[in-house]
């Protein structure tokens, strides 16, 4: 696709249904693969990251039907210990979730060997945060920089459960340990410094795992999995991804004259930090038609243009909105007062250093802001000017810059706009449709 050129001015109107939740899509594929029987998945995200997970599973003997936007995906499970040693390197593409969850899934496959690799961006991302806790269970994982960087080699072992404190509040780390715990000797207890998204716990229980969650435990949010329970194929309905909905939520609030309804959005409490911040900003947000779909809370969200107040975020809120910080930096530019984001150093080890990239690209559009070691300080009431900017291959940066372009004067050219396809393949088409409505 290359570059996309957007002009400031105009407004957006209509309804939009965002793609399926990326986190839930990955997990539905993985858990279906190690279950017995068939798992059917409605609404699975047909984007690059889940496609990487599906390709890795196929390489290990799992039958996964074609993934596109038109139908239900079927996964024929091979059981808890049925994954085959692959004949080739498992290519995780750009997907950190694929690589980190695969580490947990494969570490306990005794006597089998696996090699995980990815693109240039993924090879730069830290994996020791998963590999080191797995090593406490007896995993043998090697790679560059002492097993911190891909390519990573896994020599499957018989793992032992135990109590593991994770170094960061990360659903990927927690999920990898829970996956490893399914076939370990003895129970595995995972204690986090703060509560991370809980899709794995919800879905593993639905598949039949013996798993207890204690989000308010005295030592910290805790999940305990006991091995031995057979998983059984399920029918999974994937709600819309709130991280993708965030771009439309902010666009509606900052583009004059705009009103949008975002349909079928997952509002799992471990993911709704963005809604808490919008409330802090005084946004006129309506949560409509709340319901429960396959164990996940879902709603429609209606929002319209409105003046906004500055916000401050940090601490335990960050894991609940870590993927939304790039678009929140755009919202901060339009707010009254100075917004402060702290405790978000995790963004420096995403697909890109998102703090540095967003600061660099917004400055190219005339923004004034301070980039700190773990966040940003952004004065509000700023006017942006159209410019040539670059996603730097990051999907969330690409879509955040699109919203910034809508409130800038003049034209903005966004290079490497195709990055949006990692999580939202139809984003540019949807934007054009909402502009025409």
UniProtKB/Swiss-Prot annotation:
One Pfam family hit: EPSP_synthase
GO molecular function, one term: 3-phosphoshikimate 1-carboxyvinyltransferase activity
Keyword annotations of the record: Amino-acid biosynthesis, Aromatic amino acid biosynthesis, Cytoplasm, Transferase
Major localization listed first in the record, in broad terms: cytoplasm
Gene3D superfamilies, A to Z: Enolpyruvate transferase domain
Protein's UniProt keywords contain Amino-acid biosynthesis: yes
Binding residues for 3-phosphoshikimate: 22-23, 27, 170, 172, 323, 350
Pathway named in the protein's UniProt entry: Metabolic intermediate biosynthesis; chorismate biosynthesis; chorismate from D-erythrose 4-phosphate and phosphoenolpyruvate: step 6/7
Catalytic activity: 3-phosphoshikimate + phosphoenolpyruvate = 5-O-(1-carboxyvinyl)-3-phosphoshikimate + phosphate
CC terms in the record's Gene Ontology section: cytoplasm
GO terms classed as biological process: amino acid biosynthetic process; aromatic amino acid family biosynthetic process; chorismate biosynthetic process
UniProt subcellular location: Cytoplasm
Active site: 323 (proton acceptor)
Biological role: Catalyzes the transfer of the enolpyruvyl moiety of phosphoenolpyruvate (PEP) to the 5-hydroxyl of shikimate-3-phosphate (S3P) to produce enolpyruvyl shikimate-3-phosphate and inorganic phosphate.
Self-association state and partner proteins as the record states: Monomer.
HAMAP family for this protein: EPSP_synth
Similarity field: Belongs to the EPSP synthase family.
Protein name: 3-phosphoshikimate 1-carboxyvinyltransferase
